[in-house]
């Protein structure tokens, strides 16, 4: 009887261990993807927004990027997005964006930022908070939502 019980426990313990290891590997892989997605968004703000390096748009955004906050008449896709971002950020002679919060889950990253901008048209400095939501697939941003632009008076 003791031998049977020992054999049963041995099988039970060994049968559970690989599943736990698989769960740990899956969890580690998911965490790695989430961290890569967060790093992508941080880089977008540093390089594309703060430094106005628009040549990197092709490296960050999918060809079929869908801007859920597109202005009327804005073309969807990378070229339309590139034009809209270039024109929008071109309104500011000075620009500083600071990420206050970043949360990521799966293929989604959400951010809250503080913007300090100086308008090219009237040299007026404005400060406000916005929120952005991104969906990322295969290392490229496929969808973007944004809220909070009221502080610009547009």
PLM region descriptions:
Residues 107-115:
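A short hydrophobic beta-strand element
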Residues 96-97, 112, 126-131:
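Short, surface-exposed coil-to-beta transition loops
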Residues 16-55, 59, 63:
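Short, low-complexity N-terminal intrinsically disordered segments enriched in polar/charged residues
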Residues 90-94, 117-127:
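Short, cysteine-centered beta-strand-loop-beta hairpins and adjacent loop/turn segments enriched
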Residues 4-12:
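Sec-dependent N-terminal signal peptides
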Residues 57, 64, 105-108, 134-142:
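Short, solvent-exposed coil/turn segments at beta-strand boundaries
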Residues 54-105:
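A solvent-exposed, acidic/Ser-Thr-rich amphipathic alpha-helical stretch
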Residues 129-154:
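Short beta-strand edge/turn micro-motifs at domain boundaries
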């Amino acid at each position: 009887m003791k031998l049977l019980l020992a054999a049963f426990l041995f099988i039970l313990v060994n049968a559970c261990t690989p599943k736990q290891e698989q769960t740990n590997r899956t969890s580690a892989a998911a965490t790695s993807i989430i961290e890569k997605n967060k790093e992508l968004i941080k880089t977008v703000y540093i390089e594309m927004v703060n430094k106005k390096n628009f040549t990197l748009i092709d490296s960050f955004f999918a060809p079929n990027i869908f801007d859920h906050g597109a202005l009327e008449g804005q073309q969807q896709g990378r070229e339309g997005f590139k034009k809209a971002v270039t024109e929008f950020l071109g309104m500011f002679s000075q620009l500083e964006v600071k990420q206050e919060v970043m949360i990521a889950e799966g293929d989604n990253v959400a951010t809250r930022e503080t913007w300090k901008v100086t308008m090219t048209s009237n040299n007026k400095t404005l400060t406000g908070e916005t929120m952005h939501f991104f969906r990322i697939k295969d290392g490229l941003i496929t969808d973007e939502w944004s809220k909070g632009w009221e502080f610009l008076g547009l």
